[in-house]
Regions:
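Residues forming the ATP-binding cleft of Hanks-type serine/threonine protein kinase domains
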Residues: 415
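Short arginine-rich
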Residues: 444-446
Length: 446
């Protein structure tokens, strides 16, 4: 059987509920909404780490941060590590990546046979003797930036020139590749039957929050202020809180949210351009597997917090759908899944053997039947400045969090308290669940 072509679409920092198909009536995402209508949508997909680089390395490797050695910002996979791109390339795929991958180390390809992106570089801090101090320097600087609300205050109409140029380069690279591979008579097609994995990954809607005047004007008085009065006091979760009326004005917060929405709409439009290019090149996209996701979410001021690096739903939960209408009927899955699971899923969908030692579970059973048997647990974790462990374990509707020996544990019950404002960790009703979570945390090595 001929292996299917795969289109893997990805954004950076896309909050799970800022999508039309997720029930958001304000955002305009017609392309992703249309794709999702014929897809299996995972309503409870989580990132293995709510930090950019670890999340992406876990996605590539199919392993949790502790198991792939990427627990902190700036850590990259060891050269030659098994990735889903390397695995599919070995199985005969042409693997092409356009746009942001955020690989920091010496292995800039990680199994991609072709790569077009503005972030192809080895970070100068990725030198073993300097790595620890470099990460600490980066994070401390980042905390100062967050604490003075710089990104919120400067948000609005404008351009993030570097990110915009990178996304334009990713889009043009994808369009030129599609033309070369499927249309141009001069393209070298020694193996016309070779299957293709094409990944297109944008920076948007990662801050800085800038968008066009047209989109900004449309969203400014429509977007919500995300639970500005809803807070949860905790030494880590409430760190670097930005208070409306004190640190920023309500208008400034609204400007940032409006710009964020505009960035998502523009990314959606560019995804549509890619789909149109494939169709104009004679491709039937119903024959393709199409995946959409993000590395993590964005707080957008919920609980008074912006950006990511939290285990609140807005930060740790991600959009995820997989579309292959000729094989799977559209439906929604409520089970807890993880970005790590994409590796094993791609292997099963393409008839490729799954490498040993992964934390990845194939999602195919859930794609076939939403209620298929499933261990309804998922994990996310990272290390803070100083190497302190932060761990989240979600089982069914309960979400446990561990922040080392000094900060208190947290237990959210998303069924009883979906806004995540009440800590049930000391509630006797949950004592057995807490005991099991602590055992699992110990099994993870924390």
């Amino acid at each position: 059987m001929k292996k299917p072509n795969i289109l893997f679409l990805m954004c950076d920092e896309h909050r799970f509920d800022v999508l039309g198909y997720a029930g958001n009536r304000i955002i305009k995402t017609p392309v992703l909404d249309s794709l999702a209508k014929q897809a299996v949508v995972f309503n409870n997909a989580y990132t293995p780490s709510p930090i950019c680089i670890p999340a992406r390395q876990c996605l590539m490797s199919g392993c949790l941060p502790k198991h792939c050695g990427c627990e902190e910002y700036g850590q990259d996979l060891p050269a030659g590590s098994m990735t889903f791109a390397r695995c599919l390339a070995a199985a005969g795929y042409e693997t092409v990546a356009c746009g942001k991958l955020h690989h920091m180390g010496g292995d800039q390809m990680q199994g991609w046979t072709m790569r077009m992106g503005a972030d192809i570089k080895i970070d100068p801090h990725y030198i073993p003797t300097r790595q620890k101090s470099a990460q600490a320097d980066y994070k401390i600087a980042g905390f100062e930036k967050w604490s003075n609300a710089k990104e919120i205050k400067r948000a609005g109409v404008g351009e993030n020139c570097a990110a915009q140029a990178a996304d334009s380069y990713a889009l043009s690279g994808a369009l030129n590749f599609i033309k070369d591979r499927f249309v141009d008579a001069y393209y070298d097609r020694a193996n016309t039957e070779q299957p293709l994995l094409l990944k297109v990954s944008f920076n948007r809607p990662h801050y800085p929050y800038f968008t066009s005047e047209e989109k900004f004007s449309y969203y400014l008085n429509r977007v919500p202020l995300y639970d500005k009065d809803t807070v949860f006091d905790h030494p880590f979760l409430s760190r670097h809180r930005v208070q409306i009326g004190k640190d920023v004005s309500e208008r400034e917060a609204r400007r940032a949210v409006a710009a964020y929405y505009g960035m998502i709409e523009s990314a959606d439009s560019d995804f549509g351009t890619i789909i149109e290019a494939l169709e104009h090149a004679g491709q039937n996209i119903d024959d393709w597997i199409i995946i959409y996701t993000s590395d993590h979410g964005e707080m957008l001021g919920q609980h008074g917090v912006w950006e990511k690096q939290k285990f609140f739903e807005a930060s740790v939960k991600v959009p995820l759908f997989i579309r292959w209408p000729k094989k799977f009927t559209a439906h929604r899955v409520e089970k807890n899944v993880n970005l790590c699971d994409i590796f094993a899923t791609l292997c099963e969908l393409t008839g490729t053997s799954v490498p040993e030692g992964l934390d990845s579970r194939s999602l195919v059973p859930l794609m076939e039947t939403a209620g298929a048997p499933w261990d309804n647990e998922t994990v996310s974790h990272f290390k803070d400045v100083g190497g302190f462990a932060n761990v989240m374990i979600k089982k069914d509707n309960l979400k446990y969090q561990y922040y080392g020996e000094t900060d208190s544990e947290v237990l959210f019950d998303l069924l009883k308290n979906p806004t995540e404002t009440q800590n049930f960790i000391d509630d006797d009703t949950y004592c057995e669940a807490v005991r099991r979570f602590r055992l699992k945390k110990n099994e993870l090595g924390y």
